[in-house]
């Protein structure tokens, strides 16, 4: 922005500070110069930071005034002139406003006068119309009260009063049971319920009269409904999937009267019992005699010769009928949810006199009631079924078929328990028949065992010592029983507790244990202990192979069989070991070396012969645990069994035995039915034989070594006695030959030949 002061102002200002020249005659007087100087000084001393000066300068700059001498001289005048012009214009504007305000005041005065006149007219009109309005208001209030009373009267009559023309729908037997009947009945029930409100007031007469009238109407309606349902039940076809909805609705309504409802159910159960009994009899005997039936369906009685099929067909029919009956009754009583249960619950609450215990909690179980109704419907069928089943079981002697029938009852007991509950008649009937059939099964098994025990020919062991025929037949029957049990339900308990008794344990006690004991007792017919052991082993091996495939059978009976087999195996091992010792001749050497055995050097056994017996056969009377000094091992050469001739004969017998030893040992137990069992017993017997031979070999070597040391010492110590010297030379000659040279076989050779 251009400066308000010209460029030369500074110089002039500076010149003012310089010493003034000499006064001219034309110069102004000194006072004026001082005033101007003071003025300039005050102007120049003003700070540019002053906001007023800054605003003034900005305003001056906005006016676009040029900083000239003329402008500076006229500035004040121009500004004052502008102020005067502005004030004059404002005065003119205020004059115009004053004129307009005067006109507005005149208009307001005119309006006030007009309003006052109107107020006077209104006041006069109000005075004239007030009585008329008061009278009209009173009339309107009276009209509203009359209308309200009329509405209340209409509502009361509509709600509490049943038209006379609708009452015959509930009471007349000629009127049908349809939707109109149920609608009117529902309305009467609502009126009867709402009458309780009328009884809460001071004047109870109207409420009592209406409640009495509605009660009579309801009783008549429920009686009519009860008779109609009984009539419908007589012609009701439960096999028809399209059961009338009206009868289901009638049952729901009748449930509000528990006494009538239960009477109706009793009538229904009696009718269904008769119908199902007749249908069962028809299925048993007259299935093909009907005119419209399926000619391919034969009566159940046609299979009476086969007890299992006969009983199974009857149970299948009963199960099918039970399922159909329950489904039909569910469609009849439970298809609409728990409406009947709610109705019975409400009826029980409204009939406290029907409770046995006044403090008993009122409750109704719809599913239990349905199962009870099905049970009642099948009472006649259950009675007929029980009679026929008991006759069939009593007249049949096949234990396998009898046990299969037991499992049929077991299966259907679980089925009926799920269908009708564990306390239902059919479930209890299945349990009763199951016990009856199993009792018959046990009786049959006992009779068979009794017959076998008196048959000597059947108890005679076979020539090949195999299991007897009657025992094989019993195991075959037992296999059928176990397969039946394994394929049926209810065997999970054996898997959970394999060491405990299970459902099949009583069967084993009846069909297995007696035959096993009878077979084992027949072994007493054999005089030979080896044959007796092999015969008993064959019996137990056959029994074990039969039951081991079934965990529920092996859980309880395999351990005792295994224990008995272990004992027999020990006996057969001793027999086989003795056979090897006797056939090889090693037994004679072991018998001669018994005094040198470590087990005989610690005790002294005193024996005496039995009376009237061979002195060699002795019984041990006492065993004294006294210390016995070990005999001199060199004395073995003096034993009879170790004399050269006897020892050479024994060695020759051993050589003759070894080539066919295994075959001969196996042949000794050839009548055992298990080759694996024979092999294991023979291998252990061979191992025991090798240990015995090793003992004999060690004793022979020890005797040779001991004899050499003793004989040399005896010759050197007694040289003066010629007889003793001569005897020593003979013994030395025998020593040079040695027992080992007479019995050259080694343990290694024996193991190789017997491997």
From Swiss-Prot:
Low complexity bias locations: 12-25
UniProt-listed GO biological process terms: intra-Golgi vesicle-mediated transport; protein transport
This protein's UniProt keywords: Golgi apparatus, Membrane, Protein transport, Transport
Keyword DNA-binding tagged: no
Membrane topology recorded in Swiss-Prot or TrEMBL: Peripheral membrane protein
Renumbered residue ranges of the record's region Disordered: 1-35, 600-630
Origin superkingdom: Eukaryota
Residue ranges of coiled coil: none
GO cellular component, one term: Golgi transport complex
UniProt cross-references to InterPro entries, sorted A to Z: COG6, COG6_C, COG6_N
Disulfide bonds: none
Compartment list: Golgi apparatus membrane
UniProt family annotation: Belongs to the COG6 family.
Function comment: Acts as a component of the peripheral membrane COG complex that is involved in intra-Golgi protein trafficking. COG is located at the cis-Golgi, and regulates tethering of retrograde intra-Golgi vesicles and possibly a number of other membrane trafficking events.
Name by which UniProt lists this protein: Conserved oligomeric Golgi complex subunit 6
Gene name of the encoded protein: cog6
